[in-house]
Amino acid sequence: MCGSDDSFDDFVPDSQEPASSRTRNQDHLDDDEVPCSQRPDAANDTMVEDLDEGDEPAHDESEDIIKILVATDIHCGYGENKANIHMDAVNTFEEVLQIATEQKVDMILLGGDLFHENNPSREVQHRVTQLLRQYCLNGNPIALEFLSDASVNFNQSVFGHVNYYDQNLNVGLPIFTIHGNHDDLSGKGLTALDLLHESGLVNLFGKHSNIQEFIVSPILLRKGETRLALYGIGSQRDDRLVRAFKNNSISFLRPNAGAEDWFNLFVLHQNRPRRAMHRSTGNFLPESLIPQFFDLLIWGHEHECKPDPQYVASSEAVGDGFYILQPGSTVATSLTPEEALQKNAFLIKIKGRKFASKPIPLQTVRPMVCDELLLDKIPPGSRPILKTDRPKHTDGRYIDEIAIEAKINEMITTAKAKRRPRQPELPLIRLKVIYDGDWLNITPANAKRIGLRYENVVANAVDMVFIKKNNKPKEGKLQTENEKNITEMADEMGQVSATNLQTIINDYFINQPLVDQMTVLKPIGIGRALEQYSAIEEGGLATSANRNFDSCLMHQIDVVRKTLKKMPLPPINDPSDLDKFRDLITKDLYDMKKADSERFKNPVADVEMEEDEDDPQYYMPPQSTSRTNYASGSEDEVANSDEEMGSSISRHSKQPTTRGRGRGARGAGASRETTRGRSNKVVSTRQIDSDGFEIINDSPSPPPASRSTRGKARGKSAPSKKRDLSFF
């Protein structure tokens, strides 16, 4: 939406941009600009290595260049209960703010997960607020013009303007951020970021309360001749967002006139690689679903830093591709090789339709070294006589512990050699010890006992050593399907994620004999519970997870009771009829299990099964005070999910009306529907709304809705009164 003070009349009419206007600039390069090794030789490439247009520019180049400092997954509050690392995330966040000040950027863009928890501790909120006030509130001039309708971009707020347009605040460094899966919505749809937004310290955008339809309105910014359209979608469940793209229920608004003059930047917080092997959506967002008009994507949630923007070619005969920048986290929240890579913030310069990217190494990140040690040979003469004995050296020390400690000392030496002056002194060490060959039948060493010997040398002594036995199936014994799944889904550190474990749980219960399958509790509920319990950090409490699981279980019991009440009540005239009634209830429960089993086993119903996860009878609410990796639903979504599931078929069959997003109709509370999704062909549709924005859809139309006859009355018997099952 355009602000009332701005006009698009002077813009070039919307047309296909000539290829020559987006060719890569071949002028002289700055030494500090890192070239993109994956940049294609495309005629309409937007990434350049230098934004200078010549030796004698007509005016100061800074008047047209938008400078943005990008960082994602800061996780303030991570490890606050651990002695050595409790301030790591906050200290690095301060470094990000310092870099922004030194580089004199126009704005900071955060890609989600500023906080590690939805409800961070008071100490963490206090420290973050201090830093934001210290670095963001000052008298520095801001050259960015805010052109869009702030009441639409920040519709969750009562303040209808960007924070640096507030006359009561003196903002010198604006921050724009979306929410991630750690600081996501819960309860009444609020997060800790909402407090920072309402206090004027950050600008929170990309919140979407309507999970049936996503309408993404960009933040429009201008500096000199450069126009930036900033799009954002806060963290959503990947299955839900993929369905939105495939069902054509997500729209990105664009300026009607001069749309090709805007640099389109999209920030999101989703799984990028496939995280589940046995699901149709894979628990990730495929890059192929993203519209092609974007120039650059900032991809949050993935902690591995990829310093070079990666080009994604267009899948269409006509159309440009886009670049994806994956900044990675600024703090390590897991002990994996990907987290041990160099952490960076990124300086993005935008001029016209071109951009340049430069990684800035972070100097305060705690050093980390990850490695593996394979134990497969026992030295001659050291083999124990009894299986319960462990091989010892002549000096009485255990041979495996000698090898483990030698490897740890080598890793610590490496960490100290690479340590920079501003980095914390104690490093993070993760050694994966694999017992194989001669060591398979030997009792492994005690990992924690070894770690405690390094308590004052490393930051993570307790979980420094990870021990794994490379067990193989016995001869003549076939590996079960679930064992194969666990082996395939285990990551490089030998651990299985909660999301993949959900798939294993589903497969196990679905493949059980029908009589042994569960009636009330659903596998999805168990998987969600395990996900929350696994997210509890060491020393944390499981109170919230216990409460959520109890609530889920009681709700599922209530669903079964209500379903049984809807079934016909037979006549009861004598005591023998009570036995028949009891048998009928048993049969009803069996029929319910059978219907569920057939539906979940049917491969073509895979999408329906994913949609069922939004249903309260399957739903496990997210834990609001601990880390949740992939679930991002809220309690409000639980309350409304029955209505959403019931309306998922009729919403496409209703006679559509115009959307009515005009400025005069805002806040009127009128329902709005669109004509999206009514074509059976994969097309790119365009519409113009009353504010001069262009609605685009580059996603395929939804498949026809399936219908189920489950729950209808048996035979042709006349309807009877509902059962009274208050005793159930």
UniProtKB/Swiss-Prot annotation:
<dbReference type="Pfam" id="PF04152">
    <property type="entry name" value="Mre11_DNA_bind"/>
</dbReference>
<comment type="subunit">
    <text>Component of the MRN complex composed of two heterodimers rad-50 and mre-11 associated with a single nbs-1.</text>
</comment>
<keyword id="KW-0234">DNA repair</keyword>
<feature type="region of interest" description="Disordered">
    <location>
        <begin position="601"/>
        <end position="728"/>
    </location>
</feature>
<feature type="binding site">
    <location>
        <position position="303"/>
    </location>
    <ligand>
        <name>Mn(2+) 1</name>
    </ligand>
</feature>
<feature type="binding site">
    <location>
        <position position="73"/>
    </location>
    <ligand>
        <name>Mn(2+) 1</name>
    </ligand>
</feature>
<dbReference type="GO" id="GO:0005634">
    <property type="term" value="C:nucleus"/>
</dbReference>
<keyword id="KW-0269">Exonuclease</keyword>
<keyword id="KW-0255">Endonuclease</keyword>
<dbReference type="GO" id="GO:0000723">
    <property type="term" value="P:telomere maintenance"/>
</dbReference>
<feature type="binding site">
    <location>
        <position position="113"/>
    </location>
    <ligand>
        <name>Mn(2+) 2</name>
    </ligand>
</feature>
<protein>
    <recommendedName>
        <fullName>Double-strand break repair protein mre-11</fullName>
    </recommendedName>
</protein>
<feature type="compositionally biased region" description="Acidic residues">
    <location>
        <begin position="634"/>
        <end position="645"/>
    </location>
</feature>
<dbReference type="GO" id="GO:0008296">
    <property type="term" value="F:3'-5'-DNA exonuclease activity"/>
</dbReference>
<keyword id="KW-0464">Manganese</keyword>
<keyword id="KW-0479">Metal-binding</keyword>
<dbReference type="GO" id="GO:0035861">
    <property type="term" value="C:site of double-strand break"/>
</dbReference>
<dbReference type="InterPro" id="IPR004843">
    <property type="entry name" value="Calcineurin-like_PHP_ApaH"/>
</dbReference>
<feature type="active site" description="Proton donor">
    <location>
        <position position="182"/>
    </location>
</feature>
<comment type="similarity">
    <text>Belongs to the MRE11/RAD32 family.</text>
</comment>
<feature type="binding site">
    <location>
        <position position="269"/>
    </location>
    <ligand>
        <name>Mn(2+) 2</name>
    </ligand>
</feature>
<dbReference type="GO" id="GO:0007095">
    <property type="term" value="P:mitotic G2 DNA damage checkpoint signaling"/>
</dbReference>
<keyword id="KW-0540">Nuclease</keyword>
<feature type="binding site">
    <location>
        <position position="113"/>
    </location>
    <ligand>
        <name>Mn(2+) 1</name>
    </ligand>
</feature>
<feature type="compositionally biased region" description="Acidic residues">
    <location>
        <begin position="1"/>
        <end position="12"/>
    </location>
</feature>
<keyword id="KW-0469">Meiosis</keyword>
<dbReference type="GO" id="GO:0000014">
    <property type="term" value="F:single-stranded DNA endodeoxyribonuclease activity"/>
</dbReference>
<dbReference type="InterPro" id="IPR038487">
    <property type="entry name" value="Mre11_capping_dom"/>
</dbReference>
<dbReference type="GO" id="GO:0006303">
    <property type="term" value="P:double-strand break repair via nonhomologous end joining"/>
</dbReference>
<comment type="function">
    <text>Core component of the MRN complex, which plays a central role in double-strand break (DSB) repair, DNA recombination, maintenance of telomere integrity and meiosis. The MRN complex is involved in the repair of DNA double-strand breaks (DSBs) via homologous recombination (HR), an error-free mechanism which primarily occurs during S and G2 phases. The complex (1) mediates the end resection of damaged DNA, which generates proper single-stranded DNA, a key initial steps in HR, and is (2) required for the recruitment of other repair factors and efficient activation of ATM and ATR upon DNA damage.</text>
</comment>
<keyword id="KW-0539">Nucleus</keyword>
<dbReference type="GO" id="GO:0042138">
    <property type="term" value="P:meiotic DNA double-strand break formation"/>
</dbReference>
<dbReference type="InterPro" id="IPR029052">
    <property type="entry name" value="Metallo-depent_PP-like"/>
</dbReference>
<feature type="binding site">
    <location>
        <position position="75"/>
    </location>
    <ligand>
        <name>Mn(2+) 1</name>
    </ligand>
</feature>
<dbReference type="GO" id="GO:0097552">
    <property type="term" value="P:mitochondrial double-strand break repair via homologous recombination"/>
</dbReference>
<feature type="compositionally biased region" description="Acidic residues">
    <location>
        <begin position="607"/>
        <end position="616"/>
    </location>
</feature>
<dbReference type="InterPro" id="IPR003701">
    <property type="entry name" value="Mre11"/>
</dbReference>
<dbReference type="GO" id="GO:0030870">
    <property type="term" value="C:Mre11 complex"/>
</dbReference>
<dbReference type="InterPro" id="IPR007281">
    <property type="entry name" value="Mre11_DNA-bd"/>
</dbReference>
<feature type="binding site">
    <location>
        <position position="181"/>
    </location>
    <ligand>
        <name>Mn(2+) 2</name>
    </ligand>
</feature>
<dbReference type="GO" id="GO:0000724">
    <property type="term" value="P:double-strand break repair via homologous recombination"/>
</dbReference>
<dbReference type="GO" id="GO:0031573">
    <property type="term" value="P:mitotic intra-S DNA damage checkpoint signaling"/>
</dbReference>
